[in-house]
From Swiss-Prot:
Family: Belongs to the cation transport ATPase (P-type) (TC 3.A.3) family. Type IV subfamily.
Principal subcellular localization: membrane
Cofactor: Mg(2+)
InterPro entries membership: ATPase_P-typ_cyto_dom_N (IPR023299), ATPase_P-typ_P_site (IPR018303), ATPase_P-typ_TM_dom_sf (IPR023298), ATPase_P-typ_transduc_dom_A_sf (IPR008250), HAD-like_sf (IPR036412), HAD_sf (IPR023214), P-type_ATPase_IV (IPR006539), P-type_ATPase_N (IPR032631)
Positions where Phosphoserine occurs in the chain: S442, S1105, S1113, S1123
Keyword Coiled coil part of the UniProt annotation: yes
EC numbers on record: 7.6.2.1
Name under which the protein is recorded: Phospholipid-transporting ATPase 11C
Cytoplasmic side: 1-83, 309-343, 898-905, 974-988, 1045-1066
Tissue: Widely expressed. Expressed in retina, brain, liver and testes (at protein level). Expressed in lung, bone marrow, lymph nodes, prostate, ovary and uterus. Expressed in fetus.
Residues flagged as site, Cleavage: D439, G440, D445, G446, D481, G482
Coiled-coil regions listed in the entry: 607-643, 695-726
Length: 1129
């Protein structure tokens, strides 16, 4: 125990430097040198938050950081230390209940984490020690240990692959538990250790690994291994993410591997990813905090008023010191200011229940339990991936009903990301794969169907480029889980585009046969096998927007093949070759196809020696490796020869257009942020109806700006011109703007990445902010915006700009790829698509769904219902507590401001915990104030709740005045009834506690029946909790007043409730007061039902007369209480 603690404490020492050195097998390099074991953390995984010793203090500290909990703690301490009118139990017991329930919930969740940690930490692993396999517990693995992992086992820590049972030193891994990707990934051993396949040979290895310090990026690793043999100098090889096996990943289709541990325990990438995303706060939470401040002010005002009036009332000697209650000498000598302060605190305690202590717990339970409805929704289930929706955080359920802006990726989100090779052009000549029917069978018309033929050698060169320049892997069907291509093998790649291009080349006679021992094998049109030595791969990245390979032919020629976006390739090829291809690229983009340009160049041997040295040096760098590689790549990929371009079709997702239309009808602004070229993205936007045929497009692109020599001057002119046009067309208010979308000319904006950079980073003094301001004004007036050629960080920049607009609009981002993660994390709500580009977006999102079409129901139905439910819950909590405390306040005017409580301590304690908590919880989980089909069919209903409509000042005042009216009725109704002696048969008048019990009975029944009136969607659960709560109150009152409790000093409630109900007059009084309290609500229901029926009849007559289809009119929800939609009346 002490050693583990010491290890964890000392583990930070090695973080002082930028890299760490690992001795493979924990062997010294030279037998003559002493070996000192390094201090790294052990392999224990600790995902739990608490221990047995720190649970109580740590949990209490976290809970009392909440304003309401801390407030009630202060009230409790005041009750304990000051002579207050109520027992400390009245505030202490509810607080204890809330704290205990939360602690039990969090403790149970942490216990589950402890149990899961122990299962991992105690699992058996095999370590190579002294040329033998030694069985150990996983937590005992140390950095430098060589670990043996067998098929279908999970890697116990982050390992560098040394060797595998395959001859080429590869292994296949699935990382579903890390990033959700179920497809196999290939990892590679260093070529110098491939042959070390036995425990003896592994134990004889002397090597060191230098690598970066632990960091959470799953897809980044920088290191190098130095292997020492009989020679004096070590052989150094670079290490990258393809050599690293991550903890939590599973070995597949490989019998056995050996790897050396480089990161263990809490320093593994999986453990570093445990940390949660930045906390997002919903609009409802902000409203709750604002309401708490308002009610705290009301509480302070009540206490101040009562304290002041008490001393005004006591200014009369008879009132201050009556003959039957003379003050003691000590009371007379007490400092007056201290007495006033003590009285103020006493009134604070008396009225403290105006702040709902249990609301936070109820809100948490509502969010947690409510999130299951999304996961259980069968409409979100996708048979293709056999998965449904997933909720990664339940804190933002209601935020789904408040979205103003939707930012969506294009590829894989609006489109299927299922690529098909359509056509290509070679040296400006168009080639298209055509088919013809022969005896009912479809077959390709020759290897290449062409419209104008290029040189035969150029055709072959182009197709060879498609077969060589990619990261596709060929696997036999036995090595692959899932669907196969046929013919005994399948293609696997992280990019569907590359698979489509390789398949396209295969269709036209050139077949990629895989990569064996560093040689790429290609079968040409003559069925001959060609082999190319793969010298270097210059991987694709979103900044360069291209990738390259350097290969050596069988004749010894060294060639570079490069493919990428036209904007990336054209500046790097000879200018006279561009025009031949550019027209085809633009035409294909207009047709909605994804285009890539292909280029090559021959590298002289002398140049290659220099290039090779630069690449090796950059790959071996441990610091700034990416920047150094990028610099070398930039130098290599110049002066190329353009061969041609490809066109790949990415079909629109099912119901993508309908979803866009529904979001538009709901008043949401949809922006498409994509890295594709403008023409392709523009075509997709028309196809998915983001742009309508009558939409006037405003362009801020490189093409429109380059018409002038001074780009910034031209940009300024366009911005001013567009702003004038839009301000003249549309009114200023946002609300009228949404109506104007259907009444006036619609405008759409197109902007590309370079123009956005010019707007944000203008060289003119102070013009950048001015450009940004004008640009945002234009965007706000457009119904749709297309941002093309966007880098990932630019996507996040745009989301951040909109978030910071005046009014703080709620933003939602949806995407499927790693390049969408930045905008998903930046927006208020992040949605990940479980797509074909991995699961990085889904893993970093708040919610994940299989398809873009599911966004419609997620927002229009679930978002709408969640918001209405929790908004009603919040308003109801403050309403019922104001109803509860107002009679207590009014009672002080009739008891000389003596701080006499109106209710018994048991009622004060149980009101929020037992009598009124379950009905509102059931309502907030199950209520459907509008039918789900109606919400789906009429997206305009969504507009009625946006802008946090139900928690604005209007609804807040409505609920507050309603509570004030009902609280006044409770008190004065009972007060005036007490003026007569007819309540008892013997003429006796009820006392103080009977008076308070009648008020409390009317209160409990009224606030519960108010919720029953508000309920439209009745289930057996609603019936059970509503009528059950009322029955429990009656039962408890009989039980509490029917027994003499020995632990109570005073038996003031003994037989009060039973005697009270023996009077028929009391029964009638209670029923009458409940009816008077609810009468305005009932009257509102009747009036609005009549108006609704009248509106329906008029609508039916209008439909019959003019035969026009129209959606039902929608009543504003700003002041709704939902009682008008009750099924009771």
């Amino acid at each position: 125990m002490f050693r583990r603690t010491l290890n964890r404490l000392c583990a930070g020492e090695e973080k002082r430097v930028g890299t760490r050195t690992v001795f493979v097998g924990n062997h010294p390099i030279s037998g003559t040198e002493p070996y000192i074991a390094q201090r790294f953390c052990d392999n224990r995984i600790v995902s739990s938050k608490y221990t047995l010793w720190n649970f109580l203090p740590k949990n209490l500290f976290e809970q009392f950081r909440r304003i309401a909990n801390f407030y009630f703690l202060i009230i409790f301490l005041v009750q304990v230390t000051v002579d207050t009118p109520t027992s400390p139990v009245t505030s202490g017991l509810p607080l204890f209940f809330v704290i205990t329930v939360t602690a039990i919930k969090q403790g149970y969740e942490d216990w589950l984490r402890h149990r899961a940690d122990n299962e991992v930490n105690k699992s058996a692993v095999y370590i190579i020690e002294n040329a033998k396999r030694v069985r150990k517990e996983s937590e005992k693995i140390k950095v430098g240990d060589v670990v043996e992992v067998q098929a279908n086992e999970t890697f116990p820590c982050d390992l560098i692959l040394l060797s595998s049972c395959t001859t080429d030193g590869t292994c296949y891994v699935t990382t579903a538990s890390l990033d959700g990707e179920s497809n196999c990934k290939t990892h590679y051993a260093v070529r110098d250790t491939i042959a070390l396949c036995t425990a003896e040979s592994i134990d004889n290895l002397r090597a060191t690994i230098e690598c970066e310090q632990p960091q959470p990026d799953l897809y980044r690793f920088v290191g190098r291994i130095s292997i020492y043999s009989n020679s004096i100098e070590a052989v150094a090889r670079s290490l990258g993410p393809e050599n690293l096996l991550l903890k939590g990943a599973t070995l597949k289709n490989t019998k056995k591997i050996y790897g050396v541990a480089v990161y263990t325990g809490m320093e593994t990438k999986m453990a570093l990813n445990y940390q949660g995303k930045s906390q997002k706060c919903s609009a409802v939470e902000k409203s709750i905090n604002a309401f708490l401040i308002v009610y705290l002010f009301i509480l302070l005002t009540k206490a101040a008023v009562c304290t002041t009036l008490k001393y005004v009332w006591q200014s009369s000697p008879y009132n201050d010191e009556p003959w039957y209650n003379q003050k003691t000498q000590k009371e007379r000598e007490t400092f007056q200011v201290l007495k006033m302060f003590t009285d103020f605190l006493s009134f604070m305690v008396l009225f403290n229940f105006i702040i709902p202590v249990s609301m936070y717990v109820t809100v948490e339970m509502q969010k947690f339990l409510g999130s299951f409805f999304i996961s259980w929704d069968k409409d979100f289930f996708d048979e293709e991936i056999n998965e449904g929706a997933l909720v990664n955080t339940s804190d933002l359920n209601e935020e789904l009903g408040q979205v103003d802006y939707v930012f969506t990726d294009k590829t894989g989100t609006l489109t299927e990301n299922s690529m098909e090779f359509i056509e290509c052009c070679i040296d400006g000549h168009k080639y298209k794969g055509t088919t013809q029917e022969v005896d009912g069978l479809s077959q390709t018309d020759g290897p290449l169907a062409y419209f104008d033929k290029a040189d035969k050698n150029r055709e072959a060169l182009f197709l060879r480029a498609l077969c060589l320049c990619h990261t596709v892997e060929m696997k036999t069907n036995d090595d692959v889980d899932g669907p196969v291509e046929g013919a005994g093998f399948t293609y696997i790649s992280s990019s569907p585009d590359e698979i489509a291009l390789v398949k396209g080349a295969k269709r036209f006679g050139f077949t990629f046969l895989g990569n064996q021992n560093g040689y790429i094998r290609v079968e040409n049109q003559r069925k001959e096998i060609e082999e190319y030595e793969l010298l270097h791969t210059l991987n694709f990245d979103s900044v360069r927007r291209r990738m390259s390979v350097i290969v050596r032919t069988q004749k010894g020629d060294i060639l570079l093949f490069c493919k990428g976006a036209d904007s990336s390739i054209f500046p790097r090829v000879h200018s006279h070759q561009i025009e031949l291809t550019k027209d085809h690229v633009e035409r294909n983009a207009m047709d909605g196809y994804r285009t890539l340009c292909v280029a090559f160049k021959e590298i002289p041997p002398d140049d290659f020696e220099r290039i090779n040295a630069q690449l090796v040096e950059a790959k071996m760098a441990l610091q700034d490796r990416e920047e150094k590689l990028e610099k070398v790549f930039d130098e290599i990929e110049t002066n190329m020869n353009l061969i041609g371009a490809t066109a790949v079709e990415d079909k629109l997702q099912d119901q993508a257009a309908e979803t866009i239309e529904a979001l538009h009808a709901a008043g949401l602004k949809v922006w498409v942020l994509t890295g594709d070229k403008m023409e392709t993205a523009k075509s997709t936007c028309y196809a998915c109806r983001l742009f309508q045929t009558n939409t006037e497009l405003l362009e801020l692109t490189t093409k429109t700006i380059e018409e002038s020599e001074r780009k910034e001057d031209r940009l300024h002119e366009l911005l001013i011109e567009y702003r004038k046009k839009l301000l003249h067309e549309f009114p200023k208010s946002t609300r009228s703007l949404k109506k104007a979308w259907t009444e006036h000319q619609e405008y759409g904006l197109i902007i590309d990445g370079s123009t956005l950079s010019l707007i944000l980073n203008s060289s003119q003094d102070c013009s950048s902010n001015n450009y940004k301001s004008i640009f945002l004004q234009i965007c706000m007036k457009c119904t749709a915006v297309l941002c093309c050629r966007m880098a990932p960080l630019q996507k996040a920049q745009i989301v951040r700009m909109v978030k910071n607009l005046k009014g703080s609009p709620i933003t939602l981002s949806i995407g499927d790829g790693a390049n969408d993660v930045s905008m998903i994390l930046e927006s208020h709500v992040g949605i990940g698509i479980k797509g074909k580009e991995g699961r990085q977006a889904a893993r970093n999102s708040d919610y994940s769904v299989p398809k873009f079409k599911h966004l419609k129901k997620l927002l229009l139905v679930h978002g709408h219902l969640y918001y209405v439910r929790i908004a009603h819950l919040v308003q109801y909590f403050f309403y019922k507590n104001l109803c509860f405390i107002l009679p207590q306040f009014l009672y002080q005017f009739f008891c000389g401001f003596s701080q006499q409580p109106l209710y018994d301590a048991a009622y004060l304690t149980m009101y929020n915990i037992c009598f009124t908590s379950l009905p509102i919880l059931a309502y907030s989980l199950l209520e459907q104030h509008i039918n789900i089909d109606t919400l789906t069919a009429d997206p305009r209903l969504y507009m009625k709740i946006t802008g946090n409509a139900m928690l604005q000042l209007g609804p807040f005042l409505h609920w507050t005045f309603l509570a004030a009216f009902e609280g006044t009725v409770f008190f004065f109704g009972t007060y005036f009834l007490f003026q007569t002696s007819s309540l008892e048969d013997n003429g006796k008048i009820y006392g103080n506690w009977t008076f308070g019990t009648i008020v409390f009975t009317v209160l409990v029944f009224t606030v519960t029946l108010k919720l029953a009136l508000d309920t439209r969607f009745w289930t057996w659960i609603n019936h059970f909790v509503i009528w059950g709560s009322l029955a429990f109150y009656v039962f408890f009152s009989f039980f509490w007043g029917g027994i003499i409790w020995p632990f109570l000093k005073q038996q003031r409630m003994y037989f009060v409730f039973a005697q009270m109900l023996c009077s028929v007059s009391t029964w009638l009084a209670i029923i009458l007061l409940i009816f008077i309290s609810l009468f305005p609500e009932i009257l509102l229901i009747v009036v609005k039902n009549v108006r609704r029926r009248s509106a329906r009849r008029n609508l039916s007559c209008r439909r019959a007369s003019d035969s026009l289809s129209a959606r039902p009119s929608v009543r504003p929800l700003l002041l709704r209480t939902f009682s008008d939609e009750s099924n009771i009346l």
